[in-house]
Amino acid sequence: MSSTSQKHRDFVAEPMGEKSVQCLAGIGDTLGRRLEEKGFDKAYVVLGQFLVLKKDEELFKEWLKDACSANAKQSRDCYGCLKEWCDAFL
């Protein structure tokens, strides 16, 4: 099993509230700006897309690649972060 980043652990440790999209694991400044330009400015907006896609890993990773040019690691990290958050809080 792969280890998670500190950013991932910090995100899943508490409710997301109004956290920026850049607080998500796998999403840094560049990807965050690209998502913000498409209206995905908050982590909860990306969570909404994650839920619309029924938490499907492949669909979400494909969407993230299309939305902001995320690479495989970035999309995997973001998916894992949202999945673990959902497991803890939904």
UniProtKB/Swiss-Prot annotation:
Record key words, sorted: Chromosome, Cytoplasm, DNA-binding, Nucleus
One record GO biological process: chromosome organization
InterPro entries cross-referenced by the UniProt entry: BAF, BAF_prot, BAF_sf
Keyword Nucleus: yes
Subunit organization: Homodimer. Interacts with nemp1a and nemp1b.
Record remark: domains: Has a helix-hairpin-helix (HhH) structural motif conserved among proteins that bind non-specifically to DNA.
Protein's UniProt name: Barrier-to-autointegration factor B
Organism the protein comes from: Xenopus laevis (African clawed frog)
Taxonomic path: Eukaryota, Metazoa, Chordata, Craniata, Vertebrata
